[in-house]
């Protein structure tokens, strides 16, 4: 478990950090593996080390994926209307990942060790609660309101004069 508090969970996470070069923790939303499993899942990207050691200054990249391009429900549907962070993940891999706020951040091995080796993305996110916000153009919104008003007036006229 990435965040379990029992001794065995902690020992496994410490073993991973001592014996591998953990490069990334990618946190995926609940529902990615629906209909088989609805739980939040993470995957780890790591390389083998030549010798076991805990390098406290080593940085680990965290990426918080909000969607995979699907509905994240048991009745799986895909389409452009669903958030898809996979292209962003692939684009950032091997590049300057620090620019992808609030999706990505770095944490040191020392900070992870100080937190009982917990590898849950939420534990280290400096952006907890922040979401990327996109706003529609006000002119587009006003145009939509005007169209709806015209439709309403047309419907009201038809109701007044049913022939």
Task: Describe every region a protein language model picked out.
Residues 1-163:
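A conserved structural/catalytic subdomain of Rossmann-like adenosyl-cofactor enzymes
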